[in-house]
Amino acid sequence: SGQKVCYGDLKHSCYKIAYFQDLSRRVGFQEARQACEIDGGALLSLESEAEQQLIENMLQNLTKSGSGISDGDFWIGLWRSGEDLATTACPDLYKWADGSISPFRNWYTDEPSCGSEACVVMYHQPTANPGLGGPYLYQWNDDRCNMKH
């Protein structure tokens, strides 16, 4: 299930957002990746500021439309191997699950924190109090891959 939006003029012509209010239906990174592949797609690779803005606008419109989307982060296709790796090189080790080589990143302040957090979510917490980097909306955060989003 999920909201699907298609565009005729973009490299990635269709986007599908799957959001579950029921916490028991949320999944970890690998489960989300497999669900996308079974559905004929892939976890999102954000390759430019323009594409990031497109996704932000999509989420804003879905939130306004009464679709039930509220607080809940979204897995994107950025990850790194070596979950216990905490070196200064860590931010450069993230790669896109679909093989995209885009260097575009939209990390939240002080992210990625690395260590055991090797998979990446896009923040979507409109009701959360802002942190040092502002509202937790649309920036990226590394998280443990088994967390349910």
What are the residue ranges of the model-derived segments?
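Extracellular, disulfide-bonded carbohydrate-recognition/adhesion ectodomains
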Residues: 1-149
